[in-house]
């Protein structure tokens, strides 16, 4: 798969990911940076995807993180609205997934929890209204037999409240 850009009238089409054998997936739209999107490409290794910031006007790509462990690959990345990598989920072995999170751009990632393939715990989006950059809405079934929407504080690694449960 490739990502293309064109004018609104369909003219001036440009392949933004012109790499043979490389698949491209949209990851994040950056609302406040209209010329940029974050995409996942398997450019360095066909077995694993890594995030890139893509300028949709010029086609310039900037790699944002390296996913170098093919035996325990990163299966998903979480970015904030400014395009900062806040966390990722890494497969560990055949059936476990660990969520890693960092408090700041220059901080190391810390493992927050590990789940199995049967469990859900992933960041749906950050709560920008709270003023706390580490508050996020999480989808989880760890405390229920169905998915719940939870407001979670990653700085304290604790649930703040259940927003919705069915």
For the regions a protein language model found, what residue spans apply to each?
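Beta-propeller folds
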Residues: 1-166
